[in-house]
């Protein structure tokens, strides 16, 4: 990853880093798979004639998203793709568990909630202290899934409100869960032994564009 005042500067820095990595891998006889690499420009601007970078002489394909440590980073960092992928993962897992926690299951509500918290909830909670700064429309991708699962767990009729279900079952809304994780994340960063990590809390941008929410705002 490289930053710059413009696309040419950042691409030039990225190419220098790629060359250094390629030389290091050659000296240690490590084979790189260029086809699994992607080139993403993280910016709100529309870029035409994007400069390309190469790895071992092969052009790295341009893409509008990249996967890193289980997170899907899109070019505009609005997290929509990330939550859509998480929703698909949740739907697949829920289909496998429906016989156990669905409307027709004889399992107690307590055990159904326990299963949801232990199996399904960690899927969307992973990295939520960072991706939670997405706009509400994207967070609703997960919230609507949680609403559906809770309704199935208690076999709720159509006239029962989702807010009542969350209150009675003592399940936090997605936005409340985000704030809880964000506070813990902020506390860990402020006490981190690594100066680079702790500086993430102190060095906040002075210019805020488009009223975007930063991860540090959530805590």
Language model: regions and residue ranges:
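Short, conserved micro-motifs composed of acidic
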Residues: 16, 23, 30-65
């Amino acid at each position: 990853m490289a930053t710059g005042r413009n696309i040419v500067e950042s691409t030039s820095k990225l190419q220098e880093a790629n060359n250094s990595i390629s030389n290091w891998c050659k000296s240690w006889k490590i084979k790189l798979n260029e086809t699994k690499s992607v080139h993403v420009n993280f910016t709100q601007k529309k870029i035409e004639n994007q400069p390309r970078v190469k790895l071992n002489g092969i052009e790295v394909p341009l893409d509008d998203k990249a996967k890193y440590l289980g997170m899907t980073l899109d070019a505009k960092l609005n997290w929509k793709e990330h939550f859509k992928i998480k929703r698909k993962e949740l739907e697949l897992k829920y289909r496998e568990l429906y016989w156990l926690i669905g409307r027709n299951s004889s399992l107690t509500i307590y055990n159904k909630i326990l299963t949801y918290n232990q199996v399904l909830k960690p899927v969307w909670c992973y990295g939520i202290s960072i991706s939670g700064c997405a706009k509400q429309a994207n967070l609703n991708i997960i919230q609507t899934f949680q609403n559906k699962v809770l309704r199935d767990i208690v076999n709720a009729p159509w006239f029962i409100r989702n807010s009542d279900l969350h209150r009675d079952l003592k399940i936090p809304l997605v936005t409340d869960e985000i704030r809880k994780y964000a506070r813990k994340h902020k506390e860990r960063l402020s006490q981190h032994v690594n100066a680079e990590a702790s500086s993430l809390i102190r060095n906040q941008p002075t210019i805020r564009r488009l009223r975007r929410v930063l991860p540090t705002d959530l805590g």
